[in-house]
A protein has these predicted regions:
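Well-ordered beta-strand positions enriched in small/hydrophobic/aromatic, beta-favoring residues
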Residues: 8-9, 56, 97, 110, ...
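Mid-domain beta-loop-alpha active-site segment that forms a flexible
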Residues: 10-27, 74-75, 145-152, 202, ...
């Protein structure tokens, strides 16, 4: 860190994951457990009648369903809209840039609080991520946004001069008006469950959300109280 630094908080249990490696492992474990995954297939609509969804319409045909979980991130509202179900989820664009040859760069994952930049280290790679542009639904990389990330990080960190940029990305975070996710059954469709709107902490809250949704579908007591995340809270 560059001077001056007024203070910092160290969380010994904090960790970071490599996104593509995590997804590969999730795919492996899901298929081992019996899940069917359809790569490159678009879900375009949900069909239903009399308060129950019957099928998910996809680019490879309809898939019959006893329950439908809409966990489509920033696109959840579009999918729910095909059922006439209003879902208050908006997109917030974020950007990231990854460098190689990060010897001498920070070894510990950190958040630069004042600048809202996340710093992650994967072996000899360094990744910077940030920005929260609400209403921007583009997944195109903004050079201005990425250059801004690099400038903010350079103000706070002693970065090696020979860093090699290897990747720029932009993605969409699903956000709700009150900052809390939507987890639970929709108001009009008894077998349609929302699991979206986690904003900046989708990876953190994803496992717990998945378990609670599975328990809800099976008629079990969820691991935590879902009432505060009830999608109907915006329609009361």
């Amino acid at each position: 860190l560059k001077s001056p630094v007024a203070g910092a908080v160290f969380f010994a249990d904090d960790a970071c994951v490599h996104p593509s490696q995590l997804l590969a492992e999730l795919e492996r474990q899901a298929t081992t457990a019996g899940a069917q995954l359809f790569a490159g297939v678009d879900a375009t609509a949900v069909r239903g009648s009399n308060g129950r969804a019957h099928a998910v319409c996809t680019s490879m045909g309809d898939i019959a369903a006893g329950h439908v979980v809409i966990a489509a991130g920033a696109w959840s509202a579009e999918l729910a809209r095909t059922l006439g179900e209003p879902v208050p989820v908006e997109a917030a664009q974020g950007s990231s840039v990854t460098f190689q040859r990060a010897e001498g760069a920070p070894r510990q994952a950190m958040l630069l609080g004042e600048d809202h930049v996340a710093v992650a280290r994967y072996g000899d790679h360094l990744r910077l991520a940030g920005w929260f542009r609400i209403g921007n639904r583009s997944t195109a990389v903004s050079d201005k946004a990425v250059d801004g990330l690099k400038a903010l990080a350079a103000r706070r960190l002693e970065l090696p001069p020979d860093l090699i940029e290897v990747n720029r990305q932009a993605g969409l975070r699903p956000v709700t008006p009150d900052g809390l996710p939507l987890i639970g059954t929709t108001a009009r469709w008894h077998n349609v469950i929302l699991a979206t709107g986690h904003g900046l902490v989708g990876l953190t809250m994803g496992p717990g959300t998945g378990r609670a949704v599975a328990q809800h579908i099976l008629g079990e007591q969820p691991a935590f109280d879902l009432d505060r995340f009830n999608p109907a809270r915006f329609h009361r």
